[in-house]
Amino acid sequence: MASSVPAGSDGVLFLPQLLGERENLGSPDAKGAFIGLSFDTDLAHLCRSLMEGVCYAERRILDAFTQSGMHFNALYSRGGGVNSRIWNQIRCDIYQHPIHVLEDADNSGLIGAALLAGKGVGLIQNMEQVAKENIHVRETYYPNTSSQATYAEMQKAYMAAHNALLPTFEFLKHANIVTRNEDASFSTSSTFENN
């Protein structure tokens, strides 16, 4: 479905902060949002913009690493999202780095943690050699240069929308409106209770 929509989702932008921002770059009060919706927007646009929005947020983190002096030749991907070829390509195109999908993507975090623990307690002397023996790439994605300009502009739009909406998120945090409690029951403001 998402592959039927061009890069940039025809200007539909998704901010994926459904749980606030959990990295140190933004606000824990941030919320998710779709921007750029029109009568021409369909489910395919929403699906692709959701994938792209997650990648814009991740790109923001990668850019912070780069600005601090870290550099990447390629990135390794794991988890459930790696089972989507279109999402892997979108990630690669937005990050502008090759993406290596690991063979055992579901367990690669455990393998990595075990290798680090082994190194930490002195069981592993040559981490590079042990990693080569235990971590295998299933497939590699390379950036598509035809979408580079579109994604660069959409990354700017993402940052502008994110920054512009921060005061709105702060306002909503303190607004007297319907909220959901931690136990998943609804609470309402006094305005709703009196009606």
Spans of features found by a protein language model:
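Glycine/Thr-rich phosphate-binding loops that ligate phosphate moieties of nucleotide
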Residues: M1-N195
